[in-house]
C-alpha cells in the first residue's frame, strides 16, 4: 500500500472552479488561492438563502487509541460514497493544526484513498486562516501589555490577566514564562503563558460567529483581565476590536477544496475537542447545508467530547438540527479499551473485544440521549478478523443500532457504499427527535454534573476552591446561561487517561473554570489537561523533508 502522500500526489485533481460548479457555485463567488484552493466570497450568502436546507450527518467515534479512530477518513469516504450513489453531498471538516502535524499525527486530512487534497497545503499553511487567528490573538495580547506599560488607564491588575498569547505549535516550554524582563522600556514584568492556537478563544469565536457583525460583537466581549476592583476588562475596553476584525475579515470565509474523488470539501476552523469545542465553523456547516442535499461533518475525538460539544454548544448556538450520527469504531480501539497493548491489537482476541466493547455501548447510549439515529461503522483494517466484525455487528443489533463495515481507507468511496446506503435509509426513514442534554437556564454547576454523570458515567464531581468561586463569579457576571465546554482527556470516559473501557465508580475533578465570554461558553478544566501540548520523544517533524524539486516527504 502506498503512503497517503504518494496517493495524494497521484490523484487527478480538478480545477477548483470545476468543484464549485458541482455545487452550483459560480466562479465569481469564490476567491482563488492557486489552482486547487479557494475561499467562498461574501457574495455567496445572498444567493443561497432561498435554497432548501439539506440533511446533516455527524461522524464521531468511541474513545480512541493514541493513533486515532479514522473519523476524518470515514467522513471523506462516506462523502465520496454518497456521491457515487448519485447523492449531492459535501463534507465539512476542520483544518489541521501544525502542532499535531509535526508532533504525533504527521498530518490530518483523511487517509489512504479517502483524503482531502491538496494534502500538503491543507496540513501546512492552507489559506492562512490560522495565521490570521494567531495574529489577531497576539495583537490583543500586545495591546493589553501596552496598556499596562502606558500608565495602566484601565487599572488592570497584572496578577489577574487571563488572556494568553498563542502559537500553532506544540511547545511545552511556553506553558510558564516571565515577560517584560530587561529594563523600564521593556514593559511590565509579569508571569504569562501561551496556548496553542486551536485552543484559543479567538479560534472558537471564528468558528461560532454567524457573520462579520457577530464576529465583532464576540471579539468585543473577550475578557482579557480583571481590574483592581475585580471587574472584567474586555477587548472592547482596549479598543482592539476593529483591528482584530480587520485581520480576521478573510479568515471568516470558509475554504473550498476537494477529495481524491473530486467530492467538494469545505474546510474551515480547527478548535481542538479535548481543550476547545472541537467542531468546524458554523458558517462552513450552514453553507454546506444550503449547497448540498447531505452534509457530512465530524467532531473531534470520541463522542464524549466532540459529539457532546457539537450538540450542546454548536447546535445550540447555531440552531442546527442533526439528522443522524455515524459512530466510528476500530477493532484496535476496542481491544485497547479491553486492556491490550499496542503490539497485540493486530491479533484476534474476542475476550478483549468483549471487554472493550462496553465503551462502544456507552457511546451508543449517549448519542441516543440526544434523539438522533445512530449507525455504528467499523473502520476496517486488513488485520481484522471476520469473527471480530461479526461480534461487533451482533452487539449493535442487540441494541437496536444500525451497523456497516467501512473500507474507505483501502477502497475510497467504493469501500463506503454499505455505510452510505445505511445513511441514506436512515435519512429517509428514521426521523430524528433531536434534543439538548440540558437547558440554558440550568445552573452552571448542575450543567457540569449533568455532563459528568450522563455522558461520562461519573458518580459525582469535585471542585477545588478556585473553581467553585469562579463558577459563582461567572453566574454573578451574567453568563450563567452559557453552555459548558469540558476540557478532558480524549482517551477515557473519565478524566484519567489510564482508566479505559467503561469505568464506573469514578469522580470528575474540576481544577479550573473560566468564561470564554466571546465564544459564549464556560470552560471547565479536568484532570491534568493543559492548553499547550508538547512534542513526543520522536516528533513526526524528524521524518519530514523537501527534495530539490520542491516535493514534500514525510507527511503521513
UniProtKB/Swiss-Prot annotation:
Keywords noted in UniProt: ATP-binding, Ligase, Nucleotide-binding, One-carbon metabolism
Pfam families given in the database record: FTHFS
Keyword Nucleotide-binding: yes
Alphabetized GO MF terms: ATP binding; formate-tetrahydrofolate ligase activity
Group of enzyme by EC: ligase
Catalytic activity: (6S)-5,6,7,8-tetrahydrofolate + formate + ATP = (6R)-10-formyltetrahydrofolate + ADP + phosphate
Pathway: One-carbon metabolism; tetrahydrofolate interconversion
Keyword Ligase: yes
An example Gene Ontology biological process: tetrahydrofolate interconversion
Gene3D superfamilies in the cross-refs: Domain 2, N(10)-formyltetrahydrofolate synthetase, Formyltetrahydrofolate synthetase, domain 3, P-loop containing nucleotide triphosphate hydrolases
InterPro entries: Formate_THF_ligase, Formate_THF_ligase_CS, P-loop_NTPase
List of residues binding ATP: 65-72
Record-listed E.C. numbers: 6.3.4.3
Sequence similarity: Belongs to the formate--tetrahydrofolate ligase family.
Protein's name in the database: Formate--tetrahydrofolate ligase
Species the sequence originates in: Proteus mirabilis (strain HI4320)
Amino acid at each position: 500500500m502506498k503512503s497517503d502522500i504518494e496517493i495524494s500526489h497521484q490523484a487527478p485533481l480538478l480545477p477548483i472552479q470545476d468543484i464549485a460548479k458541482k455545487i452550483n457555485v459560480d466562479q465569481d463567488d469564490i476567491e482563488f488561492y492557486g489552482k486547487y484552493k479557494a475561499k467562498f466570497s461574501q457574495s455567496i450568502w445572498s444567493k443561497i438563502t432561498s435554497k432548501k436546507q439539506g440533511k446533516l450527518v455527524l461522524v464521531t467515534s468511541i474513545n480512541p487509541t493514541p493513533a486515532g479512530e479514522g473519523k476524518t477518513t470515514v467522513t471523506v469516504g462516506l462523502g465520496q460514497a454518497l456521491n457515487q450513489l448519485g447523492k449531492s453531498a459535501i463534507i465539512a471538516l476542520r483544518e489541521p493544526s501544525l502542532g499535531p502535524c509535526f508532533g504525533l499525527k504527521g498530518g490530518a486530512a483523511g487517509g489512504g484513498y479517502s483524503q482531502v487534497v491538496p494534502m500538503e497545503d491543507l496540513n501546512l499553511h492552507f489559506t492562512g486562516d490560522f495565521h490570521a487567528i494567531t495574529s489577531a490573538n497576539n495583537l490583543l495580547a500586545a495591546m493589553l501589555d501596552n496598556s499596562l506599560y502606558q500608565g495602566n488607564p484601565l487599572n488592570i491588575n497584572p496578577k489577574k490577566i487571563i488572556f494568553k498569547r498563542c502559537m500553532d505549535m506544540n511547545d511545552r516550554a511556553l506553558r510558564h514564562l516571565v515577560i517584560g524582563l530587561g529594563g523600564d522600556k521593556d514593559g511590565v514584568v509579569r508571569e504569562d503563558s501561551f496556548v496553542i492556537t486551536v485552543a484559543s478563544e479567538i479560534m472558537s469565536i471564528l468558528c461560532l460567529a454567524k457573520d462579520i457583525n457577530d464576529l465583532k460583537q464576540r471579539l468585543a466581549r473577550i475578557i482579557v483581565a480583571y481590574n483592581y476592583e475585580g471587574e472584567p476588562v474586555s477587548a472592547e475596553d482596549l479598543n482592539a476590536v476593529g483591528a482584530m476584525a480587520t485581520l480576521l475579515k478573510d479568515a471568516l470565509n470558509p475554504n473550498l477544496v476537494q477529495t481524491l474523488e473530486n467530492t467538494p470539501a469545505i474546510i474551515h476552523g480547527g478548535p481542538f475537542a479535548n481543550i476547545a469545542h472541537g467542531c468546524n465553523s458554523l458558517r462552513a456547516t450552514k453553507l454546506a447545508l444550503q449547497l448540498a442535499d447531505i452534509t457530512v461533518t465530524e467532531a473531534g475525538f470520541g463522542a464524549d467530547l466532540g459529539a457532546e460539544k457539537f450538540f450542546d454548544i454548536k447546535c445550540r448556538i447555531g440552531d442546527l438540527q442533526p439528522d443522524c450520527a455515524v459512530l466510528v469504531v476500530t477493532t484496535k480501539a476496542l481491544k485497547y479499551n479491553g486492556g491490550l497493548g499496542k503490539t497485540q491489537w493486530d491479533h484476534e482476541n474476542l475476550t478483549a473485544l468483549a471487554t472493550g466493547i462496553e465503551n462502544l455501548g456507552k457511546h451508543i447510549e449517549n448519542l441516543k440521549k440526544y434523539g438522533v439515529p445512530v449507525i455504528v461503522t467499523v473502520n476496517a483494517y486488513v488485520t481484522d478478523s471476520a469473527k471480530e466484525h461479526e461480534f461487533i455487528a451482533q452487539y449493535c443489533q442487540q441494541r437496536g443500532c444500525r451497523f456497516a463495515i467501512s473500507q474507505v481507507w483501502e477502497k475510497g468511496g467504493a469501500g463506503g457504499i454499505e455505510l452510505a446506503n445505511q445513511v441514506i435509509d436512515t435519512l429517509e426513514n428514521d426521523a430524528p427527535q433531536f434534543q439538548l442534554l440540558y437547558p440554558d437556564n440550568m445552573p452552571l454547576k448542575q450543567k457540569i454534573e449533568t455532563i459528568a454523570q450522563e455522558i461520562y458515567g461519573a458518580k459525582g464531581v469535585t471542585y477545588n476552591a478556585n473553581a467553585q468561586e469562579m463558577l459563582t463569579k461567572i453566574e454573578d457576571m451574567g453568563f450563567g446561561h452559557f453552555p459548558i465546554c469540558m476540557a478532558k482527556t480524549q482517551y477515557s470516559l473519565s478524566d484519567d487517561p489510564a482508566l479505559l473501557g467503561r469505568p464506573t465508580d469514578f469522580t470528575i475533578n474540576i481544577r479550573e473554570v473560566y468564561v470564554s465570554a466571546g465564544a459564549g461558553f464556560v470552560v471547565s478544566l479536568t484532570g491534568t489537561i493543559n492548553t499547550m501540548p508538547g512534542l513526543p520523544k520522536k516528533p513526526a517533524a524528524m521524518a519530514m523533508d523537501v527534495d530539490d524539486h520542491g516535493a514534500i516527504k514525510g507527511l503521513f
